[in-house]
């Protein structure tokens, strides 16, 4: 049987994700962000609820991306996720994209020219953000064009780069329905942005989200729940440069900006520059929130849930792979577990996120 990997956030899970799972082949293993997202935001609903939604709609196994993989720039996010999926025996990687191009060809380009491409990045002016530099790199070396509204396509290029030398097949699937950032409700396949924007419209949610009750009946989290914690961390931290990726310039800008900022958007807008994108600033603020220092990655793979079919695959891997099914006396990743504790502080109804939790098991693989 073909084993297909999918890298996801499911923030939240919606009909577009269900379409991706239905279109992908074989046994589907999801490497999913935990309780903090790649662009530096707390998850709308917790990782266990999102895992359950995925398993009820086509996923066979859901594993958790460690904090220092989840909350990273696209290249590191892709590299960390693909490394984990390869340990789980995937043969191909499926992903949604605005532009279906020959990503396999791009893998070959990077395998042949990685040194030249990396060297080229270092020649570009520092006024450009890293995403702008990588876009120029792909344009020069592979002739890839960018429309400016293709976040999944850009992530697909990071998947191509991370897949070099891995012997896996990239399987792009054309994104259906609303655009990534669209807030339009008039789509059967509405975007995650639209769903987050219209959470109080239950009729819209029930049509846009499979198993909508899991979304409707659980706490909805945002930066608003954590801004006071962040403000405390910034104002009381003696040396922000000890936090991952915070340099002297950013430390100064953040310390000044927090004194006049009433919410996360104001703070991000004040700190961000051409060089420091809003996404990067949000990630750095997340690092400050959870007091993240130099990154270390766990050796084990944390299993959030599986179906009967997924369980059979995991049994084959158990003796040769460090699979973690319960965090207790046996710890998994200190940084992720600390981030989970802070996430839980945001709402009294969020249950324990790490210790003692066991994988979600769906006996019938296609419960809709």
From Swiss-Prot:
GO biological process: tRNA modification
Cellular component aspect of the GO annotation: cytoplasm
Subcellular location: Cytoplasm
Cystine bridges: none
Signal sequence range: none
The protein's Enzyme Commission number: 6.3.4.-
UniProt-annotated binding residues for ATP: 7-20, 96, 152, 175
Pfam families per UniProt: HIGH_NTase1 (PF05636)
Alphabetically ordered keywords of this record: ATP-binding, Cytoplasm, Ligase, Nucleotide-binding, RNA-binding, tRNA processing, tRNA-binding
InterPro entries given in the database record: Rossmann-like_a/b/a_fold (IPR014729), tRNA(Met)_cyd_acetate_ligase (IPR008513)
GO MF assignments: ATP binding; ligase activity, forming carbon-nitrogen bonds; tRNA binding
Catalytic activity: cytidine(34) in elongator tRNA(Met) + acetate + ATP = N(4)-acetylcytidine(34) in elongator tRNA(Met) + AMP + diphosphate
Enzyme class: ligase
Role: Catalyzes the formation of N(4)-acetylcytidine (ac(4)C) at the wobble position of elongator tRNA(Met), using acetate and ATP as substrates. First activates an acetate ion to form acetyladenylate (Ac-AMP) and then transfers the acetyl group to tRNA to form ac(4)C34.
PANTHER family reported for this sequence: TRNA(MET) CYTIDINE ACETATE LIGASE
Family: Belongs to the TmcAL family.
HAMAP family: TmcAL
Protein name: tRNA(Met) cytidine acetate ligase
